[in-house]
Amino acid sequence: LAQTAAAKKQSLKRRFVRAFQRDKWLYLIMLLPFVYYVLFCYYPMYGVTLAFKQYKPKLGIIGSPWASNNGMKYVLQVVRDPYFWTVFRNTIILNIENLIITFPAPIILALMLNEVAHARYKRIVQTVTYLPHFLSTVVVVGMMNSMFNSSGIVNQIIASMGMDKINFLNDAQYFRPMYIGSNIWQSVGWDTIIFLSALSGLDMQLYEAAKIDGAGRWKQTLHVTIPGILPTIIIMLILAMGRIMNVSYQKILLMMTGTNQSVSDVISTYVYRRGITKADFSYATAVNLFQSLVSLLFVSVTNWISRRTSETSLW
């Protein structure tokens, strides 16, 4: 038995060496992202212990003493903080509204582009919709401020129609529509790439069979196109649910004013203020840890539902 086990071990070793020699360039390509994730994603995870420590910069993370209540001091503070639940609610509402509106947009655009027969027009539309993705958040918010301020083009049009000007930038009720609208404009074209790629892999014989059965464009879309890209849609939805607790704090900070803070203050901006501005690192880490656990819960539940109702899931 010992000889058999040793022989199997040698066989596995030889196969690994041969596979490595055969695909050495692929392994080399894989090495760079592997190193990136180890250094910038996994290695910093030890910083999560800040949530359970009385952090002192002079002592560092490892040298700082554990917090009171068996290390749960800051976790309990987060749970008992009424304002945390306010920003938690703002984050959930903003991201759910954003998901409901922005998630279908690239799918619809991809389906529309897929029906365009004129190749040049299709490329122009794709280029125009891709470009906003490459604009920085500062530029996008600056454009919004120029367009929607009291003397901007939008209020000029409203005034020319005999209506009162609207304070878009400071009125809390307009914050979410402006945030979501800018997200659609900035991301819809780029997100379309994934769905266009999925559409390009569909079997054209299915469309031919649908035409023979008398299906028009609409029925082909309903019964061939959408079912064909449904696995991609499900995977993208699961990944989107994992980001439901994450909001780009750069855009929020740039759009936030004293009058709209009641709806614009979210977890990421709250963590920024407590961690960076007030140097309350342990509390900010505890908030971030709670945020990550909720995101994991959303992904797990969505993946479980997907696995039970379809054959597509992340794991």
List the predicted regions and their residue ranges:
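Short, Lys/Arg-rich, polar N-terminal cytosolic tail immediately upstream
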Residues: 1-19
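A structural signal for multi-pass alpha-helical bundles of membrane permease subunits
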Residues: 19-315
